[in-house]
Swiss-Prot record:
GO terms for molecular function: metal ion binding. This is Envelope glycoprotein. The chain crosses the membrane at residues 606-626. The lineage of its organism: Viruses, Riboviria, Pararnavirae, Artverviricota, Revtraviricetes. A motif (CXXC) lies at residues 334-337. Disulfide bonds join C77-C129, C103-C118, C104-C114, C152-C172, C164-C177, C209-C215, C334-C337, C334-C558, C364-C418, C383-C395, C425-C438, C550-C557.
């Protein structure tokens, strides 16, 4: 700050606006609802920048968002790169060695190529960073009791601090703007995001400076309010000024967070949402071999990139394989149906043993699965975190995470269903900092099981049920299979994993494609993305129905299955079965019924001409009678009118009595 306009008293005052500032900041800070699972690991880089927004210092690590707040230790001279000329580093490149020769000790000639005595007094306006001697003097200034440095916040400061100025005064235009630093009055604040202090003591910094290296390391720590802020991606700015006699040299520095997803996201095609609309690929026939078959473990070949039809067919095939291995009697003849409306998946809570990892497993860095929420979870299983009372019915065992930072990976065939979404692994740091909770579940696609008679009756239109038959889903038939829960006839371990291997692969592929669809929809239709996704699944099933690959039963798309597997041309199979039932039905009909069934055109002709014939017959029968009545009515009316007309043209003569005439005479 300028000594010509401002005095420099020792600071021991408390800002009376402090409590109000805390309330304002708490009212403004709220966690950002990011489009990622809070347990997903990202590559995070905290960067310290100079006035030109060039990165001059950085630290990198792999952590979940908003859980890693390391101490930042840049050098004071690094912040002055390309800064004001009195720092002497206007032409110094970032991350380059410090300039200038070393300073000389009292014994002349002890340091070859030295310049200036290390003990020479500091003069005003001397560059502070361009030589080892100046850096040593700068270190003594920052550690001196009556000198030091102070830091003022930039644009993120409250409104009452408008008098603090802008970058031209390093945000320190008046006293009271400083919030941290190393000075005799110990500047502090209850609302700023960082604190700044010396990283080295004066005794530690002196030999480092004499060795011609950066020796004015700072320690920048995040405050509690700074750890609550989620605007670090755009960055925040501060001004730093030295507290010396005369003019206070200053500089501008910033702090920002760079977030890099560890997994690649490369779109292919003009529209990633619809680019996978392709016909089903024909299955490859296995090569002919004359060798004697031997028992080998089940291995699945690497499938080609699946389109919509293939993904949905793979779900049905995986469901059939799991059902056939566990309940062969149910697959003698059946229909497996995909539901066109949500929910598309069901969760079954299970008990399992997860694995602990001190470093993030590979699946923790996979693209976020948070966008899929399980609307139906049944059973009782393992819960982690602060489970609310409304969801404690799902918990057989609730485990609290202890202190420390580690990761909980779900066992094979399961996934963590959290209040923030689906994730393959958890970060205990996130669970300890939040009130999140998770349940270990098996994920089953919404595939319903129907008997053949029910399907045939629906298409024939002769079925009359007092109530809708209960639909059996995979979650009811196979729930708990992976962890050896209620599956009858199948043991745990390898057999259970083999039974669900193809189904799990199909579920994984379908979830991945659904996530991609939601991600693309969110970019343009934030509020309507869920509705569009539901219509998308309905259109996918409509494509299958129109292509004859499945039979549409109400809101479901059904595939015929028997011991030969899932039939791809389900409509052809349905027509074949319906024709057989039609022939059986016709064999029991009389000649009159067969007449109509054998000649469809005759039924159409009769129904077409029957109406006009009946109308014509009624006209012929009732027409003459009605016409006579009408003519007679008209004649009667006309005669009455004629009589009225005649009476108006003539007057009635008065009758004369002869006797009266005689009496008058």
């Amino acid at each position: 700050m300028e000594s010509t306009t401002l005095s420099k008293p020792f600071k021991n005052q408390v800002n009376p606006w402090g409590p109000l500032i805390v309330l304002l900041i708490l009212g403004r800070v709220n966690p950002v609802a990011l489009g990622n699972s809070p347990h997903q690991v990202f590559n995070l880089s905290w960067e310290v920048t100079n006035e030109d927004r060039e990165t001059v210092w950085a630290i990198t690590g792999n952590h979940p968002l908003w859980t890693w707040w390391p101490d930042l230790t840049p050098d004071l001279c690094m912040l002055a790169l390309h800064g004001p000329s009195y720092w002497g580093l206007e032409y110094q490149a970032p991350f380059s060695p410090p300039p200038g020769p070393p300073c000389c000790s009292r014994s002349s000639g002890s340091t070859p190529g030295c310049s200036r005595d290390c003990e020479e007094p500091l003069t005003s306006y001397t560059p502070r960073c361009n030589t080892a001697w100046n850096r040593l003097k700068l270190s003594k200034v920052t550690h001196a009791h009556n000198e030091g440095f102070y830091v003022c916040p930039g644009p993120h400061r409250p409104r009452w601090a408008r008098s603090c100025g802008g970058p031209e005064s390093f945000y320190c235009a008046s006293w009271g703007c400083e919030t941290t630093g190393r000075a005799s009055w110990k500047p502090s604040s209850s609302w700023d995001y960082i604190t700044v202090s010396n990283n080295l003591t004066s005794g530690q910094a002196t030999p480092v400076c004499k060795n011609n290296t950066w020796c004015n390391s700072l320690t920048i720590r995040f405050t509690s309010l700074g750890k609550q802020a989620t605007s670090w991606v755009t960055g925040h700015w501060w001004g730093l000024r030295l507290y010396v006699s005369g003019h206070d040299p200053g500089l501008i520095f910033g702090i920002r967070l760079k977030i890099t997803d560890s997994g690649p996201r490369v779109p292919i095609g003009p529209n990633p949402v619809l680019s996978d609309q392709r016909p089903p690929s024909q299955p490859r026939s296995p090569p002919h071999s004359n060798s004697t078959p031997t028992e080998t473990p089940l291995t699945l070949p690497e499938p080609p990139p699946a389109g919509v039809e293939n993904r949905l067919l793979n779900l049905v095939k995986g469901a059939y394989q799991a059902l056939n291995l566990t309940s062969p009697d149910r697959t003698q003849e059946c229909w497996l149906c995909l539901v066109s409306g949500p929910p598309y998946y069901e969760g079954v809570a299970v008990l399992g043993t997860y694995s602990n990892h001190t470093s993030a497993p590979a699946n923790c860095s996979v693209a976020s699965q948070h966008k899929l929420t399980l609307s139906e979870v049944t059973g009782r299983g393992l819960c982690v975190g602060a489970v609310p009372k409304t969801h404690q019915a799902l918990c057989n065992t609730t485990q609290n995470t202890s202190g420390g930072s580690y990761y909980l990976a779900a066992p094979a065939g399961t996934i963590w269903a959290c209040n923030t979404g689906l994730t393959p692994c958890l970060s205990t740091t996130v669970l300890n900092l939040t009130t999140d909770y998770c349940v270990l579940v098996e994920l089953w696609p919404r595939v319903t099981y129907h008997s053949p008679s029910y399907v045939y009756h629906q298409f024939e239109g002769r079925a009359k049920y007092k109530r809708e038959p209960v639909s059996l889903t995979l979650a009811l038939l196979l729930g708990g299979l992976t962890m050896g829960g209620i599956a009858a006839g199948v043991g745990t371990g390898t057999t259970a994993l083999v039974a669900t291997q193809q189904l799990q692969a199909a579920v994984h592929d379908d979830l991945k494609e659904v996530e991609k669809s939601i991600t693309n929809l969110e970019k343009s239709l934030t509020s309507l993305s869920e509705v569009v996704l539901q219509n998308r699944r309905g259109l996918d099933l409509l494509f299958l129905k129109e292509g004859g690959l499945c039979a549409a039963l109400k809101e479901e798309c059904c595939f015929y299955a028997d011991h030969t597997g899932v039939v791809r041309d389900s409509m052809a199979k349905l027509r074949e079965r319906l024709n057989q039932r039609q022939k059986l039905f016709e064999s029991g009909q009389g000649w009159f019924e067969r007449l109509f069934n054998g000649s469809p055109w005759f039924t159409t002709l009769i129904s077409t001409i029957m109406g006009p014939l009946i109308v014509l017959l009624l006209i012929l029968l009732l027409g003459p009678c009605i016409l006579n009545r009408l003519v007679q009515f008209v004649k009667d009316r006309i005669s009455v009118v004629q009589a009225l007309v005649l009476t108006q043209q003539y007057h009635q003569l008065k009758s004369i009595d002869p006797e009266e005439m005689e009496s008058r005479e």
